[in-house]
From Swiss-Prot:
GO terms for cellular component: small ribosomal subunit. The modification 3-methylthioaspartic acid is found at residue 89. It holds the Pfam family Ribosom_S12_S23. The keyword Ribonucleoprotein applies. Belongs to the universal ribosomal protein uS12 family. It comes from Orientia tsutsugamushi (strain Ikeda) (Rickettsia tsutsugamushi). SUPFAM superfamilies: Nucleic acid-binding proteins (SSF50249). This is Small ribosomal subunit protein uS12. It comes from the Bacteria.
Length: 123
């Protein structure tokens, strides 16, 4: 335990937390290009075919990003916007693609939670 004099001289160092989305370099979003679009299966109690894209950023970094919502129009060379946020049952997927920006269309016929999926208000 430090003495009062030591605390006055040096103070306490705060712990540096590791980032959960290091490829974004502290930015909220990053623009990238799809290198690969595929489906993968989730971890054990769950069963599905989850849609995923491998995205290359401008600085050359590649990440695995989840494509949320039902149906998508992404293919190789599509430009996408990526945000942080992991998918709990997909190992190695720590990013999400933002729907309704650049080449990614919003989810069709979406009535609730539209802002998360880039869907316009139905008339």
């Amino acid at each position: 335990m430090p003495t009062n004099n030591q605390l006055v001289r040096c103070g306490r160092k705060s712990k540096i937390r590791a980032s959960k989305s290091p490829a974004l370099n502290g930015n909220p979003f990053a623009k990238g290009v799809c290198v690969l679009v595929k489906t993968i299966t989730p971890r054990k109690p769950n069963s599905a075919l989850r849609k995923m894209a491998r995205v290359r950023f401008r600085n050359g970094t590649c990440v695995n990003a989840y494509i949320p919502g039902e149906g998508h129009n992404l293919q190789e060379h599509s430009t996408v916007l990526v945000r942080g946020g992991r998918v709990p049952d997909l190992p190695g997927v720590r990013y999400h693609i933002v729907r309704g920006v650049y080449d990614t269309q919003g989810v069709k016929n979406r009535k609730q939670g539209r802002s998360r999926y880039g869907a316009k208000r139905p008339k």
